[in-house]
Every structure is written in C-alpha cells, then in structure tokens.
Design a protein with these regions (language model features):
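Short extracytoplasmic/periplasmic juxtamembrane "stem" segments immediately C-terminal to an N-terminal membrane anchor
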Residues: 37-55
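Charged, solvent-exposed interaction patches on well-folded alpha/beta domains
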Residues: 1-42, 59-71, 75-78, 82-86, ...
Length: 238
C-alpha cells in the first residue's frame, strides 16, 4: 500500500473516531437534559450536630425554591452552596448532581473551640475567632466560659467580634485553651472556668475544691505551672 493511501486511511479513521466520540458526548448531554431531580441526599463531613438533614431540606425549600422535578442542568449549584454557607454553623458546602437524578449536598460545619455563656447571652468562637450563636438543642463538647463574658450586638451575631479589644481577648482565650490542653498535670483538667466582675479568669480543676484566680489570659505557661506545682508540692502538705 502506498504511503499516501495509508495516510488517507488513517485520517479517515481518525475523523470517524472523533465523530463517534462527539456523537456519544452529544447523546449523553442530550440524555442528561431530560433527567430531572428526584431526590436530595445530604451528607456531613464531621460529627457536629448544628445542622441536620431536615434543616438543609427546609432551608433549601425556603430559600432556593423548588428543585424536585427540575432538570439537572437547570440546578444552580453555586447559588445553593452560597446560600448554605450563609448559615453561621456551615463552614463549607459542596453541591453536585448525578445521572440518577439525585442532588447531593455535602456540609462541613464550623467547629467551635470555646463556648461562652452567662445564662442570658451565649455564643461559640471558632479557631479563627469567628463568633456564632449557640444552638437551641445541641451543645458542642468544648471548653465553656461563664460569667462576665464580652457582649455581642445581638443574640444571632456572627462574624469576628465587633471591637479590637474583644478580638484580642478572644485570641488570648484561644491560646489559653491551647496551652491548658497541652499540659500533663492537674491544670489541664479544668472543670469550671468563669470571668468575674473585675474581668479576671477564675478556674477550678476537676475533682478539686480550690478556686484559682488566674487573672488575665496571659503569662500562661507560668500560671499553669504554678497550679501544677501547688497540687504537686503544697496541697500534699496540708
């Protein structure tokens, strides 16, 4: 077979192959346009309980509108993600559809580091200092601070604390928790922690009766070391 004939045959085969692939892609896209959403599947990336599957379904129904029965290619996935991420307890969301007509939503909840509550006002802060409201029926298992806590503008406030002084204090409290939980002695086992009327931290260690006036959340290593030394050397002599 002459070379130019071979080249022509190869070219024709390539054209036929590309045409076939194009037809398959076109057919798949055409079929996809005919598929409508018939269900919603919600999954969570963590074990927190700030939002539930029913919460997500209700939120989408109220804010996005009808999606069941809509064509897959008409679902505005980015809008859904943005809506869900407007909720204070949702850190990130991902939305996608599959050929079986299911709208999938994956939720990553905002993880709290410290809970603040004085009985009439309360909120969480995350590791970046983001403030978000307490949940009506779920309490995260994190360090809790009571008493004379900083006041937020509203009970539903979310975002960084409104004043630089509050943001600085929250940053110190996050460092307080990190240092406390890194300890191996009794100071690690904080049972109660509150802010008194003077703004000083006071704490009680689990299974102990002593109340320690910790003061401002600074000089952390030295203060925690003193608490540990008290239980190691002073209390046994009493």
């Amino acid at each position: 077979m002459k070379p130019f004939v071979r080249h022509i045959i190869h070219a024709l085969l390539a054209v036929l192959f590309c045409t076939g692939i194009g037809f398959i892609v076109y057919n798949v896209r055409t079929q996809r346009k005919l598929v409508t959403v018939n269900g919603l599947k919600v999954e969570f990336a963590d074990s927190l309980k700030f939002v539930s599957e029913n919460d997500i379904k209700g939120f989408l129904a109220s804010n996005y509108g009808a999606y069941i029965g809509q064509r897959l290619d008409s679902i505005k996935l980015r809008i859904i993600e943005t809506m869900l991420e407007s909720r204070s307890a949702v850190l990130e969301s991902q939305a996608w559809t599959t050929e079986d007509g299911i709208l999938h939503v994956r939720i990553t909840q905002r993880a709290p580091e410290i809970r603040f509550d004085n009985g009439s006002e309360g909120y969480y802060i995350a590791d970046d200092g983001y403030v978000f409201p307490l949940h009506k029926s779920y309490t995260a298992d994190v360090l809790s601070v009571h008493g004379n806590i900083p006041s937020m503008p509203t009970s539903s406030y979310k975002g960084l604390a409104p004043t630089s002084e509050q943001r600085s204090w929250f940053s110190q409290m996050l460092e307080f928790k990190r240092v406390a939980y890194s300890k191996k002695g009794p100071a690690k086992k904080i049972d109660s922690l509150w802010v008194d009327n003077s703004g000083d931290l006071r704490l009680r260690v689990a299974n102990e009766e002593e109340i320690f006036v910790f003061g401002a959340p600074e000089q952390l290593e030295d203060k925690f070391a003193k608490i540990d030394k008290y239980f190691a050397y002073i209390k046994p002599l009493k």
